[in-house]
A protein has these predicted regions:
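Membrane-embedded alpha-helical bundles of multi-pass transporters/translocases
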Residues: 2-363
Length: 363
């Protein structure tokens, strides 16, 4: 075993973060777009879509502890946790595409069954991949400073993935839909994301090493572990905070999509985007016009007829990019703010500002 103070190479830290970036291509797509994909593209009713989303989450709550036991009892020449990243990479990519593919000519019942099965498979693969990955950092190094750096790299990668998913998914869907078939647009876009996920998972597998062998002779019962957790008040607070945080993310993602696509003034959005040269009728010639067209950020359609245009897709994506950019900026400023004002003060202030912003969005 290496000395605990050994520094990890940059490549390994960056490679470690790649798998979490890949996981967020699925996670953020679910948070921001999955409900609306099922209702607006796949053709399910709102109640059917809700059921399709509910059952895999309930299954996930049952499967996660099972996956934890499986990962802990895995022993291969690659280690305990790295193999799961390799084993799930290919199936993850395939199911990711299938989950956003709309079969043609199927009855509503068959579509509901297909959506439920593919979504459940995707959630299962997510757990099989992400739970071992979450434990991987603890066996790469025992140096607390190096673990902190690993988490920093991981956090940066997550925000980059969120930036890409939130900012480019809808414009690419509209681009590949070619003005009419959003089912095809979603399938092509998710194929691109799936291939990227596959590459990122392989990067993590081939650039990391498990150096620390977990202690295997510790005896504990699940019942006692759970009882200990319930007595741990900081853990309970963090659990509730995380629960509400992700609930808000889910509500906000679906609500913003619905607002911009079904309620917001499309002419007002068009005029604002036209001022930035992002419409077909913009008089200005942009240096990066070809790139804007390539990523789907050019609004198609005339101002007088925006019913089938991609104006809402582009506007929604710009809002997502703006929000993620602010998040990344705050992350970069957080260490200096924490040193000056203290971690608790900065955290409480951040939560308060986030609450105010959440209310302001729906004012």
């Amino acid at each position: 075993m290496k000395q605990l103070s050994d520094k990890l190479p940059f490549l390994e830290k960056a490679g470690y973060s790649a798998a979490d970036a890949a996981a967020n291509f699925v996670f953020m797509t679910m948070i921001l777009f999955q409900l609306n994909f099922y209702t607006d593209v796949f053709g399910l009713s709102a109640s059917a879509a809700a059921a399709v989303l509910l059952w895999p989450r309930l299954w996930d709550a049952v499967f996660d502890p099972i996956m934890g036991v499986l990962a802990d009892r895995t022993n291969t020449r690659w280690g305990k946790f790295r193999p799961w990243i390799l084993w799930t990479a290919g199936p993850w990519a395939v199911v990711m595409v299938l989950a956003y593919t709309t079969p043609e000519g199927w009855s509503s019942g068959m579509l509901i069954a297909y959506a439920t099965i593919t979504n459940m498979l995707l959630m299962t693969l997510y757990s099989m991949n992400n739970m071992p990955y979450s434990a991987l950092g603890g066996v790469i190094t025992a140096d607390l400073n190096e673990r902190a750096k690993l988490n920093s790299f991981r956090f940066i990668a997550v925000n980059i993935a969120q930036f890409i998913v939130g900012g480019f998914t809808l414009p690419l869907v509209a681009k590949f839909a070619m003005g009419h078939d959003r089912r095809h647009g979603w399938q092509v876009t998710m194929t691109i994301w799936a291939v990227l996920c596959l590459v990122l998972f392989l990067v993590t597998f081939f650039t990391t090493r498990e150096r620390i062998k977990p202690v295997s002779d510790v005896k504990s019962s699940p019942k006692q572990d759970f009882a200990d957790l319930l007595k741990n008040s900081p853990w309970i607070v963090m659990f509730l905070m995380t629960l509400f945080h992700f609930a808000i993310l889910s509500f906000r993602g679906g609500a913003l999509y619905n607002y911009y696509h079904h309620y917001a003034d499309k002419v007002a959005m068009y005029d604002l985007l036209d001022g930035f040269g992002l419409t077909e009728t913009s008089g200005s010639v942009q240096a990066g016009a070809s790139f804007v067209d390539f990523i789907g950020y050019r609004v198609h359609g005339a101002r007088a007829d925006l019913g089938n245009s991609n104006v809402a897709d582009v506007f929604n994506s710009i809002i997502n990019i703006t929000g993620t950019s602010v998040t990344i900026t705050v992350i970069l400023l957080s260490p200096s703010l924490a040193r000056r004002f203290g971690k608790k003060a900065v955290a409480v202030t951040g939560f308060a500002l986030s609450a105010v912003n959440s209310f302001a969005i729906y004012w």
